[in-house]
Amino acid sequence: MRIAQLANFIGPASGGVRTAVAAMGQGYADAGVERLLVVPGPTDAVEETEAGTVVSVRAPRVGGGYRLIVEPWRVVDALERFAPTSVELHDKTTLLPVARWARRRGVATVLLSHERLGDMLAMRTGLDTSARAPIALLNRVVVRSVDRLVVTSGYAEREFRSVAASARCPVTRVPLGVDLETFRPVPSRQRDIAPRDDGVLRLVHVGRLSREKSPHLAVATAVELHRRGVPVRLDVYGEGPHLDELRALAGSAPVTFHGFVAGRDALRRRIAEADVALSVCPGETFGLAVLEALACGTPVVTADRGGARELVDVTSGGWAAPYPAALADAVLDLAARPRDHLRAGARRRAERYPWSAATEAMLAVHAQVTGLTGLVRATA
């Protein structure tokens, strides 16, 4: 089996898509699959890695640290040389011309959808209805262009349910995963924090500081708790275009913006040292930040809708309507519960989502669309 993964809108500091592509790609290689990854880069380059061949295609910057491949034919050149048995798309807009090439060549295509475009654009622009018609048209084009659509949650699946059925495009739900070895609890004796008897409720938010990720809602929740007189501290890890807005929103509340944390172990310690993680975006199709917090033993408060809500249960966190007052209530409810029980429940919840399970499910999808079965090793 020869799988080509294609990703756009990906950069050194980008989050979920980059993490998912890397984790599954390594899993493919470990299973004996020949794997190619094509991504945008500052220059054309080819690198041989233990997880397969990585081809960087020269692409311009489009803001926010991202690069965008604007010449799909150059991706096709890399595919012609690699001769994949299937192509795995991680972008459903700019790379669709590659799906047309694959269909002409008889190469199977799998699209993994990472966002609900309507909700993402609504959160980014504040316009709730104006883009619905063109997005519905795009979704119809998508399901007619690929052989299999993969979604990560029930929330993500609902966007495509009717159009996929009418196009007879099979839809498979594959939850993503978390690195359970990297993201793990910090023993209480090793926590580098102030004594717990100071009474401060420590919150953490990890994510890109861009409107579609709802960092404003996380900050506003901390501000609401501060307004109520709750001793609270919010540490925000991430960077993005709305930092100045968020600082203004925080005002005099105890909110600290730390920027991007490059080391995963350093980030893990900061998450594990918090009492509650705020991952409150109502438009996430999955929520890798939620799983990473849970894996660190930190309970999560999230919105009562969206893919992230599907990851949290009563043993590992709480949820509320995506408004600061409601989320603040959920935080206080969580803080009143036994800490050790919540931390243990959070870790148990994360352990349901190892990357090996996601990789095996995706390999099964590729086997189905290509008809190549029994050609890969089981992943660890």
Language-model features: locations:
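A short, active-site helix/loop in glycosyltransferases that binds the activated sugar's phosphate group
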Residues: 136, 140, 144-173, 178-182
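Short alpha-helical donor nucleotide-sugar binding micro-motif in glycosyltransferases
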Residues: 260, 268-274
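Conserved donor-binding/catalytic core segment of Leloir-type glycosyltransferases
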Residues: 189-223
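Nucleotide-activated donor-binding/catalytic signature segment of Leloir-type glycosyltransferases, i.e.
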Residues: 244-261
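Conserved acidic donor-binding segment of nucleotide-sugar-dependent glycosyltransferases
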Residues: 313-325, 332-338
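Short hydrophobic beta-strand element within catalytic cores of glycosyltransferases
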Residues: 299-302
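Nucleotide-sugar donor phosphate/pyrophosphate-binding loop at the beta->alpha transition
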Residues: 108-110, 119-141, 180
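Aromatic "clamp/platform" in nucleotide-sugar-dependent glycosyltransferases that forms part
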Residues: 282
